[in-house]
């Protein structure tokens, strides 16, 4: 998995999660928003990022910039599925990904689906085990994609 110098225009953004977070100070509570964004060009490049700000659009913008900086390239088989079975892990999250026959579609939940569709995977079977926390699920999916090897 190598780093990508992609044009900003060709990467498509997907907001995976928006969360209101609170900081308790002497005078009361301060609210801000955290966003998790996945970017990809549907041709094997994907990145993710998180951002925090006082307003939702600002948080999404920060997360998007962070995601574009972390964009990496992934090895796909025939441009539609992964070359072999792989297990990605991060924290308590474990994502099992298996290649699928043409026409199967993306069988994945929430955060994992966002990553795989951004990469450009069209046929895959996945199962998220352990925590289904979006941050950990996205990182576990990216970890699994990093392990992919191109078949000769």
Swiss-Prot record:
The keyword Hydrolase does not apply. GO terms for biological process: translation. Gene3D superfamilies: 3.30.160.20, 3.30.230.10. The keyword rRNA-binding applies. Pfam families: Ribosomal_S5, Ribosomal_S5_C. One of its GO terms (molecular function) is structural constituent of ribosome. Residues 11-74 form the S5 DRBM domain. With S4 and S12 plays an important role in translational accuracy. Part of the 30S ribosomal subunit. Contacts proteins S4 and S8. PANTHER family: MITOCHONDRIAL RIBOSOMAL PROTEIN S5. This is Small ribosomal subunit protein uS5. The lineage of its organism: Bacteria, Pseudomonadati, Bdellovibrionota, Bdellovibrionia, Bdellovibrionales. The gene is rpsE.
């Amino acid at each position: 998995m190598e780093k990508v110098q992609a044009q900003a225009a060709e990467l498509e953004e997907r907001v995976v999660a928006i969360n209101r977070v609170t900081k308790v100070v002497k005078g009361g509570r301060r609210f801000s928003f955290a966003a998790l964004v996945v970017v990809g060009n549907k041709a094997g490049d994907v990145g993710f990022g998180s951002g925090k700000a006082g307003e939702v659009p600002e948080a999404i913008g920060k997360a998007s910039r962070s995601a574009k900086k972390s964009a990496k390239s992934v090895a796909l088989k025939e441009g539609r599925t992964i070359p072999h079975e792989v297990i990605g892990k991060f924290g308590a999250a474990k994502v099992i990904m298996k290649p699928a026959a043409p026409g199967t579609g993306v069988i994945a939940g929430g955060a994992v689906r966002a990553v795989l569709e951004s990469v450009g995977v069209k046929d895959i079977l996945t199962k998220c085990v352990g925590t289904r926390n979006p941050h950990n699920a996205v990182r576990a999916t990216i970890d699994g994609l990093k392990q992919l090897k191109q078949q000769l």
